[in-house]
Each structure stands twice: as structure tokens, then as C-alpha cells.
Amino acid sequence: MSGYNSVFKKDLFKNEVVLVTGGGTGIGRCIAHELASLGATVVIAARKLDQLTATAEEIRKLGGKCDAMQINIRDSVKALELVQAIVAKHGKLTCLVNNAGGQFISPASSLSTKGFATVVDLNLNGTFNMCKAAFDGYMGEHGGSIVNIVAECRNGFPRMVHTGAARSGIINMTKTLAVEWGPYNGIRVNCVAPGTIVSSGMKNYPESVVEVVSTTDWMSPSGRYGTESEIAASVVFLLSPAASYISGVNLAVDGGSSLSKGFPEGEELAFNPEGSLMPAYVGWPEGKDNVHNLKHVDAPPKINELLDKYKKSKL
């Protein structure tokens, strides 16, 4: 397969079958492309079939193997049926990436109990449903690797208390499952916690938030935000044999931003407003290599401008 330029060995996931929930857009789409470029048979699943179909077609045009299947992760019965369908078609399910989820910006004082419960149900309960389905449908007898996409929330999550609570629950659940399921043929369960990432998810932000985000990317040790490819690469590492002795961890992929709070002089004086000296990893092909005109990131123009800037220093 040509097209997506992964930093990993091209046949790393040959003969592996990987389910990526929320795989039609944003970070999930990038994870699917990276895994397919490494030889995996990828199944992407979400509620909206049109987005899944478009991504699956992209991957197949590049020579990869990808199926699109619809799922509501809040339905535990449907989650198990999805896993069973994958095993029936492909004979196995060796890896699961729980990327599906969602939230909205709201201060806790304005958040209804229904809104809180809805986000917790989708993110926390939905992730458990998929983990349990993978265990019951295949991994309990054969082993496997699971990566849950969460968020860096150790210091709270202002304006998103619902997703902060849910993601914290997933992190604890991940550690618990790593202990309980490790004896079942070596199942490994880990988390990846992205920092601020240049992705299509930023389309959901109000314009005022996009304006602030687009002008403050330098206020961290890395001097920039992350790329979808950097999250995808972290997931690939944790799924791969290179992480065979890693289980129960929450890997923060945030350029050190979660460690950089509390400067007495303020972040404005601690970091370099001229930009980043940390090269970015961007796997999307460019120029003459982008023969299928793959769209890199479907984000607001100001966010796309940031990605263009990061590409100039990419690895």
C-alpha cells in the first residue's frame, strides 16, 4: 500500500485485524490510514455510515484493506454483534481502538444532569461496552490489545466536567482491565491521552475559541499543537509487539503541555512566541506523492494554517 507515509515498518500489522471506533473522521480516520498502511485489515465503525464509507474507500484506493460498519457504542448488544460479525468475516479481532466519543463545551453551572449523563454514557459506558464485546467475542480466548483514546484530565477539565469525569473513569477502567484481563492470554489494555491536536474536531468549536486556539499554540514546551499522525503513531506503538510488556498505562501525547503549568513569570514569558523547534510527524502524503488527493485535515482555515506551518518542520 502506498499513500500514507508511516514511520513504522510497512508489514508491522500484516495478518492483524483491527477495529477502530469513530474511524470515519479526524484522529480515528488517521489511525485507520496508518494501520492500513502497515498491512492491517482495518474495520472502522461509527454511527454515521457516510463518513465511514468515504474513509474506507480512501484506504482501499491506496491498496489497503478496510471495512465500514455502523455501530452505536451505547448499545452493548450491538457492540457484541459487531465483534461477532468481524470474527465471522475475518476469523479474528486482534486489536481494538476505542476512539468513538464526543462532548460539548459548557461550564458545570450551566450543564444539565441529562447533558452530563449523556456524555458519560457515550464515552465511559460506550468504551466499556466495546471492551467487553471484544473480550466476550474473541480476546478472552485468544488475547489481543486494546487502546482507549481519552484526554489529559489529571488537573481537571474546566468547561467540560462531563467528559473529564468520563475520561477519568476510562483511565481507571483501563488500569483495572489490564490487571483482570492480563491473565487471559496476555490481553493488554492502555490509554492514549492527546493534548490539543490539529484535527477536524476543531470544527465543533465556536469561532471565538478557534481564534484563541489558533494564536496560542506556542504556549507550551513544544511550541505547537500535536498532529493526528502523532496520535496515530502512539496508538500503533501501544498495539504493536514493541509494547508487549506495557499494559495499564495512560500515555500523554501532548508535547509536555500538561507539565508546563505554574511558571511564576507566566507562560507568556516562559515560552517562545516565534514557534516550535520540535519537528512534527505528519504522515499524510503531499505534492506529487498525494496521487489520490487525500484531504489532510478538515478543520477551520486558521487551524489548517497551523498544520501547514508544522509541516515545514516535519520529521
Stretches found by the model and what they are:
Residues 17, 22-25:
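Conserved glycine-rich cofactor-binding loop
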Residues 97, 183-188, 246-248:
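Short, small/polar-rich loop/turn modules that mediate ligand/substrate recognition or access, typified
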Residues 107-108, 112-120, 216:
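Substrate-binding pocket helix/loop in short-chain dehydrogenase/reductase
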Residues 136, 179-183, 244:
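Alpha-helical segment proximal to the catalytic Tyr-Lys
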Residues 147-169, 174-183, 196-197, 257:
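Catalytic loop of short-chain dehydrogenase/reductase
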Residues 184, 191, 195-219, 261-291, ...:
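A glycine/serine/threonine-rich, flexible loop-to-helix segment
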Residues 224-253, 258-259:
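C-terminal substrate-recognition "lid" of short-chain dehydrogenase/reductases
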